């Protein structure tokens, strides 16, 4: 069973990193990665249907324009059931508190521990065992 993941980060090299670190899962058809490079682009993509089913959004917090916390609030308004994992290089208590308050499923500090992230993804609703 394939599922989609939307990665939101204004740094284009993050897309390359995720493609590299999820190469095996992508080849096996476990995950289909989609990328947005701003909060606004993520909302445009979220308004459309994903094939296969979208099960999670991974969003950076610090982005120009709509930041990740504003994006999280908007996603939770439109799709309250959609898990959103916040990813940031700045893991301070205030950002963590706000992410929790706005409904983040996880708060991940960069550099991303991809083994841990993959374990967290396997626990999501809609993910085949």
Placement of each model-derived feature along the sequence:
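Receiver (REC) domain active-site loop signature in two-component systems and cognate sites
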Residues: 63
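Receiver (REC) domain switch/active-site region of two-component response regulators
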Residues: 113
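Two-component/phosphorelay signaling modules centered on CheY-like receiver
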Residues: 12-35
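Active-site T/S-Asp motif of two-component receiver
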Residues: 58-60
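Receiver (REC) domain switch/output surface
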Residues: 117-129
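Acidic, metal-coordinating helix/loop segments flanking the phosphotransfer/catalytic sites
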Residues: 19, 35-56, 77
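Alpha4 helix (beta4-alpha4-beta5 surface) of REC/receiver domains from two-component response regulators
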Residues: 70, 91-108, 116-119
